[in-house]
Amino acid sequence: MASPNRYDRQGITDARARVPGPARRSLLAGVAALGALGAAGCSRVATASSAPGGDLLDRLRAQGVVRLGIAGEIPFGYIDRDGELTGEAPELARVVFKRLGVDRVQPVPTEFGSLIPGLNSQQFDVVAAGMYVNAERCEQVIFADPDYQMLDSFIVRKGNPKGLRDYRDVVAKKARFATGTGYAEIEYAVEAGVKESDILIVPDQVAGLNAVEADRVDVFAGTALTTREVVKKSAKAEATKPFSPLVDGKPRVDGGAFAFRPTETALRDAFNTELRALKKSGELLRVLKPFGFTEAEMTDLTAKELCRR
């Protein structure tokens, strides 16, 4: 999970991406994909505001709709089989923006690596993709406080025959290792001693499950949430117990949040006010629970502290 945040849990630029720590995919990749996004994109492109704190919230209220950048990653933000927008971030966005006076949300699907470039080029108004907060991304966008926290987990064959519990086990047991495009898990594995050239990169957790089931790899690394969900119907694979990856020898817990353009501090602050109220009332968990989130994923982490990492 987007992983959901990782080498950019969306590619080296993903809701997970690689950065000076374990960032998630390198956020600068995806410029090419941005071109495609612009071609396909929205008919309406918002203009940047020079007003202190930005005036986007006022404009969204007047329009009655907010455009959400999503990456098609279950359970964070995706279009379901009925063609409807759903996922933890879009559903949370519906609740928060309704409270802020914006009645509708409109999806703008793109690659994970194009989310930040797309946001900053006005292709959409906010990133709603469960994106991990890290220092590299904080240089390009501003984040709300995290609406969830996340540990890592592995997909392994039933019974976990190699006894893989964390990245150090992958190295010690010379396990064949895979993870997703731009996932922060790339950085975590390299930090533990896995050679980057030995990592099999696949599009997402479904492809990772398929690789494990087909015995192409011994293990696929993702977020505890995404691995837990994707193996539910598998007869050949299981998810390991969640664990914290080590960064500079210290356990790391990631947090996912909504991203905004750096000029739109007023919108970010208003969003945070409503998010804090949802956390305090317990409504946040009720909104996220249908997507596999539990009390263990609730968090008091702040964007400020995660941006320092």
Predicted feature descriptions by range:
Residues 51-129, 139:
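Extracytoplasmic small-molecule ligand-binding "clamshell" domains
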Residues 59, 157-176:
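Flexible hinge/capping segments at coil-to-helix
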Residues 131-139, 188-190, 218-252:
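A ligand-binding cleft/hinge motif common to bilobed small-molecule-binding domains
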Residues 149-153, 234-272, 294-309:
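Periplasmic-binding protein-like
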